[in-house]
Amino acid sequence: TQKKMTTWKSQLFAGVVILILFTLLITPLLALATRSIASFDTRSEQQGVLTSGITFENYRQLTINRRDSMFFVPPTTAIRNSLLYAAVVVILALVIGMPAAWALSHHSDSVFNRYIDPVLMLPLGTSAVTLGLGFIVALNRPPLDLRASPILIPIAHTLVAFPFVIRSLAPSLRSIKPRLRQAAAVLGASPYDVFRTVDLPLVGRALLVAATFAFTISLGEFGATALISRPEYPTIPLMIYRYISQPGATNYGQAMALSTILMVVAAVAIVLIERIRIADIGEF
């Protein structure tokens, strides 16, 4: 049973911890948002030199190809790419992760679980940069020469998000009482029907949580994407890196603006997923 914090010391401690966590979470986000509408000294090559005034010039500059670069990509294209990749990652991660989590939940005390589960968790212990470099080295010859293909990005994102999907689904699948499956089988349901009519409805919340994890991880993934992405198919994090790696106050302001856009897109995506969920299923 959970104990309520009745003493003023415990309440004060909890309040301080919450305040610190809230500050550490909100302060960086507010800093990005405020700097995205701040004016910078464009005559200075130093990044982040603030001047007085509020402006949306940084957002307007995102649509202007100031250097007439052939690799210029408007932010709408980067946002579209990121959302498309994230949608594909959600589908791939759930299609692969659901059977894997189901197998792990049905062999929780076996040698299969003991050795296969750590293998499936390898992306958590491996840097995304290492994963991207491995793709470049391994997939460099026909018929698996995918280095120039945009499909490589959602594949990499799926591998990064895969462990989170399994960890979200496996506990829910393990919590399903065996007698429910047995009752469905006695009534004549096939193994597929048992999975469809018993398992899936009971893990609806976990499925939505897993989908949200996969979606947001894909939106913000940078390490592997930086190595395998093509210049004409950038994501929002890559565009932010392009701006922040170039000197000048204008590029710095554009990086702040695009970072704010990424923050808003991720927040809107999570809210939409929460809004379209079935009532009482998938509640966070």
Language model features with spans:
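Membrane-embedded alpha-helices of multi-pass transport/permease systems
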Residues: 27-30, 34-37, 95-100, 133, ...
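Interhelical loop and adjacent transmembrane-helix boundary motif
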Residues: 1, 6-10, 36-46, 53-70, ...
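Transmembrane alpha-helices
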Residues: 16-30, 122, 126, 159, ...
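Short hydrophobic faces within alpha-helices
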Residues: 79, 103-104, 122, 179-187, ...
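N-terminal signal-anchor/first transmembrane alpha helix
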Residues: 3-31, 114-116
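Hydrophobic positions within alpha-helical transmembrane segments of bacterial inner-membrane proteins
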Residues: 86, 90-98, 102, 106, ...
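Transmembrane-helix boundary motif in ABC transporter permease subunits
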Residues: 88-120, 137, 141, 178-180, ...
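Membrane-interfacial helix termini and adjacent extracytoplasmic/periplasmic loops
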Residues: 1-5, 42-53, 64, 72-76, ...
